[in-house]
């Protein structure tokens, strides 16, 4: 929002340097991005009155005699198509500085002396977007009613003597998107009540309210007011209004459109003016668009309307995209005589989505989406009507149509003096706080410690006690808050047992060569429950940034897969990533957080070189990494079991659930081909992951691995070759071997797996190496032989395995 310092002075008695004021406003919470002085760097630019204008034969040039307030007129050669005798124009004299620090000198053009330059607005620093269309390709001509004299500087007449404060407004401070709102804000800072005058409107035309049948859905437009102004004369706006518009970054159009923009800047209430001929059938309807309806907007852009767009129609066809922009078919034109003014409150969410959907964000839509002051609907309508009567010779017809007129009660927030002082660390009295609230335009009730504060409707951002704390703090002055040491209970320092365990796990994983990734906690609803054995109700965000960040994650693998995609798209194929973080669910109607650890592997364990071939990462490599982690934190191998699982997003035959003492703590496996195929960057890659619930296993952690003395007695090894049915797993076999191997069974290792044409159909060959050890005495062959016989017999009976 570009705020004119001179316009602010209509509301407040300001004598402070504009740049100092900008600094003061910034310190209270509304950032002033810049303070610009349009006349800065310009000199010797004056009003000139063209006395004579002759065409120079054979050229597009004109030789002009111009009165610039000196004893004699000066001669200037000008090539603008709209230069003519009798006009008041902008003249840069000899030695003048114009935009771009360009210096103007006397010279000759086509051999004819020229003692200066007749300027267009762009040449003295105006942006193209604010220059009126009629002057875009020529010089600027002062309106006939402009109070200017030859020889006086142009800066005041054009509003260039002003200072423009650029309010960098956050979405919660929509109240400052108007001059009145800015005046309330600045007034609170300088402790002065702004002079905001009521509108007194006289109706001098016949009643018109029976001319139009208006149908409005209150959900789409809770307030919808109309007035009719007859016999308007379309023309140029007075110069005072034009300069206020272009200093706010808005191009003057004509006296009707300019009034609607001016009132929007003044009150924050977007307005629209229709040519009354648009509604010749006497109908106006506010509704949702129908499928395949189209509308050509005022910017000549044709849009295909969405069924969620709010539109205004003439009873049949659309004439405006509500809250965004009017239609070309209802535009006020040069021959317009009767105008219908609209002042309304539209559903802000719908307006925002329409503006975004059609890539057409406007000054009006930005105000509706942030929230307008419902109390200004009537004032804005009457102000626009008053200005059209004064500046366009219009007749204000009696009556207004209030198709919808919902009311919004001011919010009331309760707090206490002691609470505000406690949060701010101040010792302000009740009287001091009441004074601050009065400066802000809030009313206060209550007694003693209690504060009952009524918030005006222009302030949408105040709803809870913490908001009142902020208001008191910023108006009192953050610079005035005393610096104090925080009061904390004494502790012995150090990490808690859980923090220590979590850090230890992270250190171990990093020691395995993995790099830490940090991903978003927010994801899409679909991704939130992927890679999860038993998805729980998700935690949804009420006001998401977009649909892909609307849900709190239930797993960490999703974020690692996104990180892998990002890296692989940039030719980084060898990946070993991990993330330790929280996941969320809404089970049993409570919001729950769990600490998880996840890892992702892709590529090779070692790159190929002259010493060895490369080896691709597979399930067993990742399982080995996880086994080493469990051992390092004191979880025994025999307590861990891997069971085949079907999990969404995971490979159906290369995925296992991880169980510790029969309790599920996570999963391990390969991403499903369906997942990697959908992402171009991941296509063709084999990606392995695991994820474990750290909260579940933290109670199982010990201080670390315990060292054992080397055995004093020799071990005995025996090989065991088995013909195994395909549906029997290694885990089942090892469990039976451990069950029957006796107390001296020390270790089991798989040494070979084979499945081929030489093996019986439906079977596979697995060979094991079993190690037996008596740590207190020499182990005999007889003891080992007995154990082997028992193992073989049990495998044959329980799992239908043949010993080869």
Curated annotation (Swiss-Prot):
Domain of life (superkingdom): Bacteria
Record carries keyword S-adenosyl-L-methionine: no
Domain FDX-ACB: 711-804
Location of this chain's protein in the cell: Cytoplasm
Primary location recorded for the protein, binned into one broad class: cytoplasm
InterPro entries: aa-tRNA-synth_II/BPL/LPL (IPR045864), B3/B4_tRNA-bd (IPR005146), DNA-bd_dom_put_sf (IPR009061), Fdx_antiC-bd (IPR005121), Fdx_antiC-bd_sf (IPR036690), NA-bd_OB-fold (IPR012340), Phe-tRNA-ligase_IIc_bsu (IPR045060), Phe-tRNA-ligase_IIc_bsu_bact (IPR004532)
Coiled coil: none
Phylogenetic lineage: Bacteria, Bacillati, Bacillota, Bacilli, Lactobacillales
Residues annotated to bind Mg(2+): 461, 467, 470-471
PROSITE patterns reported in the protein's UniProt record: B5, FDX_ACB, TRBD
Name of the featured protein: Phenylalanine--tRNA ligase beta subunit
Cystine bridges: none
Annotated GO biological process: phenylalanyl-tRNA aminoacylation
Enzyme Commission number, as recorded: 6.1.1.20
Keywords: Aminoacyl-tRNA synthetase, ATP-binding, Cytoplasm, Ligase, Magnesium, Metal-binding, Nucleotide-binding, Protein biosynthesis, RNA-binding, tRNA-binding
NCBIfam families associated with the record: pheT_bact, YtpR
Residue ranges of domain tRNA-binding in the record: 39-155
């Amino acid at each position: 929002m570009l705020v004119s310092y001179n316009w602010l002075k209509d509301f407040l008695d300001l004598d402070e340097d504009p740049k100092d004021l900008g600094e003061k406003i910034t310190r209270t919470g509304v950032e002033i991005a810049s303070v610009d002085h349009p006349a800065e760097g310009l000199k010797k630019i004056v009003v000139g009155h063209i006395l004579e204008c002759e065409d120079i034969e054979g050229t597009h040039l004109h030789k002009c005699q111009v009165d610039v307030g000196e004893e004699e007129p000066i001669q200037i050669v000008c090539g603008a198509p709209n230069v003519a005798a009798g006009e008041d124009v902008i003249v840069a004299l000899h030695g003048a500085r114009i935009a771009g620090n360009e210096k103007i000198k006397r010279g000759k053009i086509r051999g004819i002396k020229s003692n200066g330059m007749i300027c267009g607005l762009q040449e003295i620093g105006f942006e193209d977007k604010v220059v009126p269309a009629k002057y875009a390709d020529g010089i600027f001509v002062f309106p006939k009613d402009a109070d200017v004299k030859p020889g006086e500087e142009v800066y005041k007449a054009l509003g260039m003597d002003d200072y423009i404060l650029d309010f960098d407004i956050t979405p919660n401070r929509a109240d400052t998107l108007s001059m009145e709102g800015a005046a309330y804000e600045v007034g609170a800072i300088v402790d002065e009540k702004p002079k905001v005058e009521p509108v007194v409107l006289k109706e001098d035309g016949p009643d018109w309210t029976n001319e139009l049948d208006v149908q409005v859905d209150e959900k789409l437009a809770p307030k919808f007011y109309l007035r009719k102004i007859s016999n308007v004369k379309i023309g140029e706006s007075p110069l005072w209004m034009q300069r206020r518009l272009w200093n706010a970054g808005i191009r003057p159009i004509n006296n009707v459109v300019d009034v609607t923009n001016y009132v929007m800047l003044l009150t924050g209430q977007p307005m629209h003016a229709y040519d009354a001929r648009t509604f010749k059938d006497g109908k106006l309807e506010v509704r949702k668009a129908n499928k395949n309806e189209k509308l050509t907007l005022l910017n000549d852009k044709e849009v295909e309307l969405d069924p969620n767009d709010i539109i205004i129609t003439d009873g049949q066809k659309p004439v405006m995209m509500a809250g965004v922009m009017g239609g070309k078919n209802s535009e006020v034109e040069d021959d317009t005589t009767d105008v219908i003014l609209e002042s309304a409150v539209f559903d802000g969410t719908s307006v925002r989505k329409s503006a975004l959907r059609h890539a057409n964000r406007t000054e009006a839509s930005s105000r509706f989406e942030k929230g307008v002051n419902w109390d200004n609907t009537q004032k804005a309508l009457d102000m626009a009507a008053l200005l059209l009567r004064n500046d366009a010779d219009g007749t204000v017809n009696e009556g207004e149509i209030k198709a919808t007129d919902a009311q919004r009660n001011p919010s009331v927030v309760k707090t206490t003096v002691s609470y505000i002082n406690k949060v701010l660390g101040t010792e302000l009295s009740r009287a001091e706080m009441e004074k601050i609230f009065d400066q802000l335009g809030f009313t206060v009730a209550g007694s003693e410690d209690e504060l009952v504060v009524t918030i005006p409707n222009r302030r949408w951002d105040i709803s809870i006690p913490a908001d009142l704390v902020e208001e008191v703090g910023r108006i009192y002055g953050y610079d005035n808050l005393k610096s104090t040491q925080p009061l904390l209970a004494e502790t012995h320092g150090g990490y808690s047992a859980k923090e220590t365990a979590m850090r230890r796990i992270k250190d171990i994983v990093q020691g395995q060569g993995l790099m830490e990734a940090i991903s978003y906690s927010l994801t899409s609803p679909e991704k939130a429950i992927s890679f999860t054995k038993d998805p729980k109700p998700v935690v949804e965000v009420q006001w998401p940034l977009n649909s892909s960040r609307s849900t709190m994650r239930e797993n960490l693998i999703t974020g690692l897969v996104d990180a892998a995609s990002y890296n692989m798209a940039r030719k980084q194929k060898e990946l070993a990533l991990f993330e330790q973080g929280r996941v969320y669910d809404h089970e049993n109607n409570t919001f729950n957080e769990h600490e998880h650890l996840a890892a992702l592997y892709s590529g090779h364990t070692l790159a190929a070189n002259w010493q060895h071939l490369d080896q691709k990462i597979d399930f067993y490599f990742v399982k080995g990494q996880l086994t080493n982690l469990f051992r390092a934190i004191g979880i025994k191998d025999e307590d861990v079991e891997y069971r085949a699982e079907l999990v969404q997003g995971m490979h159906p035959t290369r995925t296992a659930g991880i169980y510790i003492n029969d309790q599920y703590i996570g999963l391990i496996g390969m991403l499903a081909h369906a997942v990697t195929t959908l992402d171009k960057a991941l296509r063709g890659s084999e990606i392995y992951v695991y994820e474990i619930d750290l909260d579940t296993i933290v109670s199982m952690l010990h201080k670390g691995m315990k060292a054992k003395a080397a055995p004093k007695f020799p071990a005995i090894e025996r090989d065991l070759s088995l013909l195994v049915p395909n549906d029997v797993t290694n885990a089942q076999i090892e469990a039976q071997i451990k069950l029957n191997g006796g107390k001296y069974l020390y270790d089991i290792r798989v040494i070979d797996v084979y499945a081929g044409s030489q093996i019986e159909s439906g079977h596979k060959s697995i060979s094991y190496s079993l190690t037996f050890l008596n740590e207190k005495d020499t182990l005999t062959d007889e003891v080992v032989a007995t154990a082997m016989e028992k193992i073989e017999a049990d495998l044959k009976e329980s799992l239908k395995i043949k010993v080869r």
